Regions:
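Active-site neighborhoods and metal-handling regions in enzymes and metal-associated proteins
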Residues: 1-238
Length: 238
């Protein structure tokens, strides 16, 4: 998984550079597929029943599971790219949100807080720690800024399958105090949040989740290995 994680980190970085004003979502999707194949690996998301793409791409009020289509990126958009791959039978998953062109100070702060929230959550991914501690650390950062932590979707275990136990909510659940981390687990830890009400609705395509109130969203995700010495981010750029 470390080899796959390094490759996915590089792909994520290249897709961010590629996603400029005037580029379409489907162009990003095509680029992602080429990069995954050039790395000698396979797309992960297209193994999900009914989903036929290598990426999920969203902007602004759309948070996740967005089908890459002919939408064009404009200056001021907040773009989210979620991409996964399979290497030697193991899935890895990562997501980044970023502004394109001219974005506001408010938007920039919004993105910075998401990155901080994810960092605090990952720091809790230690042997013997609970899922509750991860969720609480994530949620605390968001609440301090009056942002909404998404409660309808979660992070997850990842490895031989794309979605595995445990589920890792963005909102702390006291019952998750009983779910303890063990050495060697790999987790897709993701912060999903909104500038307004975090309630989500699903588009007519039956995939794309977006905020009901139309507020701005973002998502940051890394695949993390739980080791005896602490968390190791497999999809972090080297």
């Amino acid at each position: 998984m470390k080899v796959g994680g390094t490759a996915l980190a590089q792909i994520k970085s290249k897709l961010r550079e590629f996603a400029q004003v005037g580029v379409s979502f489907i162009d990003i999707e095509k680029q992602a597929t080429v990069l995954i194949q050039e790395a000698g690996m396979q797309p992960s998301f297209s193994t999900v029943p009914g989903y036929h793409w290598s990426t999920c791409i969203m902007k602004n009020d759309a948070l996740c599971h967005g089908i890459p289509d002919n939408q064009i990126i404009a200056s001021g958009d907040i773009i989210t790219i979620d991409v996964g791959l399979i290497n030697q039978g193991y899935h890895l998953d990562t997501t980044i949100s970023f502004g394109v062109g001219e974005i506001t100070t408010k938007q920039r702060r919004f993105l910075e807080i998401g990155q901080k929230s994810l960092s605090k959550a990952i720091a809790c991914a230690k042997v013997g720690q609970s899922v509750y501690q991860i969720s609480r650390a994530m949620e605390k950062v968001l609440l301090e800024e009056n942002y909404g932590a998404v409660y309808q979707l979660t992070g997850h275990g990842v490895g031989k399958e794309l979605h595995m136990e445990p589920t890792i909510p963005c909102v702390a659940n006291p019952e998750d105090r009983r779910v303890r981390l063990t050495e060697g687990q790999t987790l897709a830890i993701e912060v999903m949040y909104s500038m307004g009400n975090p309630q989500l609705i699903v588009d007519a395509d039956e995939w794309t989740f977006r905020t009901k109130d139309g507020s701005l969203t973002a998502m940051f995700e890394e695949t993390v290995l739980v080791t005896a010495h602490g968390p190791e981010i497999l999809t972090k750029g080297r």
